[in-house]
């Protein structure tokens, strides 16, 4: 008997927007998935051939890349940070929109010109993506990896600048920071394990097409 497909969903900002899309694609999680008090991480769906796991966004990419999950939804920031060759991202889901940006204290930004940077010390959850961005600009970057609370790093002298996701900019403003450069726009993507796609194309390709139709992409699955 073929094992159910495992579909990885991220906790946090994307989850709320992803749920209606999942349901529209014909995948409805069991009621326990919506229970905020539940500590379960693995859930059944209305389809016996599909299960859902709910994990941290960065872990979605890892589970899918290593084949523990065959499909998932995750932000393009995570895809770019890890650059797993095992991941195929066939559909931009047009949800979870924000941007990855560089921010610094307002007092510094008054007289600062990013075009003149030669060396920066940055606190970020995205060290690889950040290094690549600055390397392309010819700027030497010292990246300090944090998993959260980036906004407080400049005030405590840990780093002069931060690289983080920005939506409304309110969190930056409340912490005395200002956005000075946008690195890239971010949106959520459907991801698939490449090996699983080849081995279980009959199961996975129709799901990919369902998501394509939902966002109005008419191209056939490559």
From Swiss-Prot:
PROSITE patterns recorded: ATP_P_PHORIBOSYLTR
UniProt-listed Pfam families: HisG
Enzyme type, top EC level: transferase
InterPro entries, per database record: ATP_PRibTrfase_cat (IPR013820), ATP_PRibTrfase_CS (IPR018198), ATP_PRibTrfase_HisG (IPR001348), ATP_PRibTrfase_HisG_short (IPR024893)
Record's keyword terms, sorted: Amino-acid biosynthesis, ATP-binding, Cytoplasm, Glycosyltransferase, Histidine biosynthesis, Nucleotide-binding, Transferase
Involved pathway(s): Amino-acid biosynthesis; L-histidine biosynthesis; L-histidine from 5-phospho-alpha-D-ribose 1-diphosphate: step 1/9
UniProt-recorded Gene Ontology molecular function terms: ATP binding; ATP phosphoribosyltransferase activity
GO BP annotations listed: L-histidine biosynthetic process
GO CC annotations on file: cytoplasm
PANTHER family: ATP PHOSPHORIBOSYLTRANSFERASE, ATP PHOSPHORIBOSYLTRANSFERASE ATP-PRTASE
Subunit architecture: Heteromultimer composed of HisG and HisZ subunits.
Domain notes: Lacks the C-terminal regulatory region which is replaced by HisZ.
HAMAP family, alphabetized: HisG_Short
Protein name: ATP phosphoribosyltransferase
Lineage of the organism: Bacteria, Pseudomonadati, Pseudomonadota, Alphaproteobacteria, Sphingomonadales
Gene that specifies this protein: hisG
């Amino acid at each position: 008997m073929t094992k159910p497909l495992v579909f990885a969903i991220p906790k946090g900002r994307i989850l709320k927007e992803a749920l209606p899309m999942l349901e529209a694609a014909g995948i409805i999680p069991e009621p326990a998935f919506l229970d905020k008090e539940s500590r379960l991480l693995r859930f059944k769906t209305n389809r016996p051939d599909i299960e859902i796991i709910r994990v941290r966004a960065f872990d979605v990419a890892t589970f899918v890349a290593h084949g523990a999950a065959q499909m998932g939804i995750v932000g393009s920031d995570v895809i770019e940070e890890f650059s797993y060759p095992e991941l195929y991202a066939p559909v931009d889901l047009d949800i979870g929109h924000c941007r990855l940006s560089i921010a610094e204290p307002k007092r510094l930004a008054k007289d600062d010109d990013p075009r003149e940077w030669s060396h920066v010390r940055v606190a970020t959850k995205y060290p690889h993506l950040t290094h690549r961005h600055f390397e392309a600009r010819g700027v030497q970057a010292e990246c300090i990896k944090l998993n959260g609370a980036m906004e407080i790093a400049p005030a405590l002298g840990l780093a002069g600048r931060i690289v983080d996701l920005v939506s409304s900019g309110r969190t930056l403003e409340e912490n005395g920071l200002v956005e000075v450069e946008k690195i890239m726009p971010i949106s959520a993507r459907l991801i698939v394990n490449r090996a699983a796609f080849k081995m279980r194309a009959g199961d996975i390709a129709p799901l990919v097409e369902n998501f394509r139709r939902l966002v109005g992409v008419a191209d056939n699955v490559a």
